[in-house]
């Protein structure tokens, strides 16, 4: 099926409950496992989020969600998949930098995210991503994403009082002085 014909045949379904969604995907699992399954999953997430809400979360609407030359998903797209928010940053909470509000990860994620870019000091991943609810992480390298997981439950834990205090302090310590 050519891609243009695929798009012509798309049908938008509305569901009232999560049970309806689960039943639909259970009954139509083969649709998601076919040639355009990932694209259908992407469309499902984007339509569920809604155009207006998506635009309100993306800092730079000129940045594409998918890189046109290489097909890489943007950080906003990765964050949308992992947290439900299409924010461009991986730090904890929102930050105000010189009057510009930068949206970050606003709560502990079910699935974590870590990146080689942090080791290179390009970004700082917050504790909400580093310490997810489940011991599953997406690891980003320069060219691809890898899913890591473990049955070892001790790798993740709820945020401690000290971690909570440090996170709150860091919200107000915008220059990272530590004082």
Provide a role label for each language-model segment.
Residues 1-172, 176-179:
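Cysteine-dependent deubiquitinase/ubiquitin-like isopeptidase catalytic cores across multiple families
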């Amino acid at each position: 099926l050519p891609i243009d014909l695929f798009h012509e045949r798309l049908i938008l379904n509305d569901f009232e409950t999560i049970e309806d969604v689960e039943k639909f995907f259970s009954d139509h699992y083969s649709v998601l496992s076919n040639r355009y399954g990932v694209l259908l999953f992407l469309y499902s997430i984007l339509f569920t989020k809604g155009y207006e809400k998506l635009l309100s979360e993306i800092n730079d609407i000129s940045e594409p969600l998918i890189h046109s030359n290489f097909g890489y998903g943007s950080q906003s797209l990765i964050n949308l998949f992992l947290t439900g928010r299409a924010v461009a940053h991986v730090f904890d909470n929102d930050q105000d930098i010189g009057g510009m509000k930068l949206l970050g990860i606003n709560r502990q994620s079910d699935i974590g995210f870590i990146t080689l870019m942090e080791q290179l000091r390009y970004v700082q991943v917050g504790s909400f991503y580093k310490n997810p609810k489940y011991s599953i992480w997406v690891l980003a390298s320069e060219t691809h994403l890898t899913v890591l997981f473990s049955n070892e439950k001790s790798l993740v834990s709820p945020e401690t009082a000290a971690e909570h205090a440090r996170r709150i302090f860091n919200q107000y310590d915008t220059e990272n002085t530590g004082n």
